[in-house]
Amino acid sequence: MSKTIAINAGSSSLKWQLYQMPEEKVLAQGIIERIGLTDSISTVKYDGKKEEHILDIPDHTEAVKRLLNDLIHFGIIGTYDEITGVGHRIVAGGEYFKESVVVDDKVVEQVEELAALAPLHNPGAAAGIRAFRKILPDITSVCVFDTSFHTTMQKHTYLYPIPQKYYTDYKVRKYGAHGTSHKYVAEEAAKMLGRPLDELKLITAHVGNGVSITANYHGQSVDTSMGFTPLAGPMMGTRSGDIDPAIIPYLIAQDPELKDAADVVNMLNKQSGLGGVSGISSDMRDIEAGLQANNPDAVLAYNIFIDRIKKFIGQYFAVLNGADALVFTAGMGENAPLMRQDVVNGLSWFGMEIDPEKNVFGYRGDISTAASKVKVLVISTDEELCIARDVERLKQTIS
């Protein structure tokens, strides 16, 4: 019996979940937010309790110290020695990593080197890895990459139609993201459908603040909507998704506040999407409230959001030459029935039909009608559990 921590570290946050393995029992979970500020927030949930404290956490090393001390303070563990493994979620693994790996110095350097592919994620993840290695140097540390699942894409799918020297010299290509989530929900969908995964064609829709759609053929990713970075694909919470790239130099020339390409990319990453179009919020709950109030900007943002998701799902019906099921997961995918209904209503030609009595908040499972030729499933993703499982698997290889 061992205890494993799954870590999702960002530039100013550290989200964690502690498991008892191999039972896969969640012992505690929490998040440390606003790292680097004097009013950082540490939240711990365990045994039905919730503890929240505001304090000064200047960096990721102090965040990890706080996390470990909280585990002891609240009696969740007795000593640090009870923790035998830690797994880190890494958004971008580039072409270096086709599967999860045990961390060493070279791995950390490569994660940092790939920061350009995930500037909002990889630097914080690397800081989290370094912090754990400093404080718990003797435990097994593992990196689990969002991009690994998508390394099964064929070359004609992952290459962009630009001169090949940009791939050979600079590795410019589609990498995808959310792979851990897409892999998990595809496996769960096969169980739900009672069929082997290697016989199924699935379209998985991870719809959270970040949005990605994946075409899954017999258990493998054959195409996905995120690209060289997680900025590509449908409209998202704060990200634009796909736009005409010629817009970037045009905006630099027109808007004095946008001085260079980095400024435009920052705007596309952080000030666009639902929040940017609506001017209200990047949260679908706020957008739906705007719909009820007939706010025209909320209506416009919502309509663009639905339109872009439908288009990617439609593409992947073509890529797969049909599909057995459409799977919704992540924050909005699991908790926004109106969004699911409006997406599927626009895809009825493919033989999908939602049962309105099942398509309600909190329902998990098959939400399609008996007559629906393509099943529509709602499955809760569990990236943290996937990370913990990979830690346990890799621990066996080095024991």
Swiss-Prot record:
The active site is at D146. GO terms for molecular function: acetate kinase activity; ATP binding; magnesium ion binding. Disulfide bonds: none annotated. Its cofactor is Mg(2+); Mn(2+). The keyword Mitochondrion does not apply. SUPFAM superfamilies: Actin-like ATPase domain. Mg(2+) binds at N8, E383. PROSITE patterns: ACETATE_KINASE_1, ACETATE_KINASE_2. GO terms for biological process: acetate metabolic process; acetyl-CoA biosynthetic process. Pathway: Metabolic intermediate biosynthesis; acetyl-CoA biosynthesis; acetyl-CoA from acetate: step 1/2. The record marks H178, R239 as: Transition state stabilizer. Its main location: cytoplasm. It is found in: Cytoplasm. ATP binds at K15, H206, V207, G208, N209, G210, D283, M284, R285, G331, M332, G333, E334, N335. Substrate binds at R89. Mg(2+). Can also accept Mn(2+). Its EC number is 2.7.2.1. Belongs to the acetokinase family. HAMAP family: Acetate_kinase (MF_00020). Catalyzes the formation of acetyl phosphate from acetate and ATP. Can also catalyze the reverse reaction. Homodimer. This is Acetate kinase. It comes from Streptococcus equi subsp. equi (strain 4047). The lineage of its organism: Bacteria, Bacillati, Bacillota, Bacilli, Lactobacillales.
